[in-house]
Amino acid sequence: MKIVFMGTPDFAVPSLKSLINEFGVEAVFTQPDRPKGRGKKLGMSPVKEVALEHNIPVYQPLRLKNEPETIEELKNMEPDFIIVVAFGQILPKEVLDIPKYGCINLHASLLPKFRGAAPLNWSIIKGEKVTGNTTMLMDVGLDTGDMLLKDEVEITDNMTAGELHDILMERGGELLVRTIKGILNNEITPEKQNEEETCYAPMLNKEIAKIDWSLSAQDIHNLVRGLNPWPVALTSYDDITMKVHQTRVEKGDSNKEPGTIISVDKTGIKVSTGKDILVIEKLQFPNSKQLFVEQFINGNSVEIGKVLK
């Protein structure tokens, strides 16, 4: 059996390793080397590093859909499966039609919920209690293909996007192995997605990160968790941008304008919101490292009554 793998970031690495260990991988497609770090030296993707460690041929098309010679090489491989995990490029129909059993994508949500670029972040931001991975047969749409298998994961009250990322990353490989075996044994019936249940998970940006203090404390807490470790929730203190890394919700209302700092002690900075109170536990000012409030107030003052914007 021939498997071609397409993926790029850390999230795709456990999936690639699982496929190598279980079936072997014929070739790997990943994004071109990019400048990294302060020196801007060209750096390989995490997937490329693993492929080279296992002596697997690596292809790095700038845009696969615009490279007919590379597509021809892919056809000549005659793959049974193309497995796609966070590749970062849209595959044209010509590529989708190549493998015997189709192109299978691992998507980090329980489809049809949270189609798009940032599903695990939006699952937390929107207050979901359960998410997971879905394997699906790819078609020309954006995460619209028939679903194959799902693996559910609980989102706990204080779980961050970074923590959820690592859980889904590690569990993705096992789900892909089960999916491939299930297809080969005719044990999986592809399931159409219900279009009425869809919602989208657009790419994250710094505009999304700005805290609206008129929202409830729970909604803001979800935003903080969903944007940790990147791009991190933001607010303004005296026109200085402050990153908010960690929070908790406290029941009760202060009857103060949303965003007003109510109290400060070593357990956190209490801020009024549209509903209940948000307690900031870890923050970061420009040109400084992130600190727990207990550390921060040792050398800095926070003015009670000040309104965060």
Curated annotation (Swiss-Prot):
Its EC number is 2.1.2.9. The keyword Coiled coil does not apply. InterPro entries: Fmt, Formyl_trans_C, Formyl_trans_C_sf, Formyl_transf_N, Formyl_transf_N_sf, Formyl_transferase-like_C_sf, GART_AS, Met-tRNA-FMT_C. One of its GO terms (cellular component) is cytosol. The keyword Isomerase does not apply. It is an enzyme of class 2 (transferase). It catalyses: L-methionyl-tRNA(fMet) + (6R)-10-formyltetrahydrofolate = N-formyl-L-methionyl-tRNA(fMet) + (6S)-5,6,7,8-tetrahydrofolate + H(+). This is Methionyl-tRNA formyltransferase. One of its GO terms (molecular function) is methionyl-tRNA formyltransferase activity. Attaches a formyl group to the free amino group of methionyl-tRNA(fMet). The formyl group appears to play a dual role in the initiator identity of N-formylmethionyl-tRNA by promoting its recognition by IF2 and preventing the misappropriation of this tRNA by the elongation apparatus. Signal peptide: none annotated. (6S)-5,6,7,8-tetrahydrofolate binds at S109, L110, L111, P112. Keywords: Protein biosynthesis, Transferase. Belongs to the Fmt family. Pfam families: Formyl_trans_C, Formyl_trans_N.
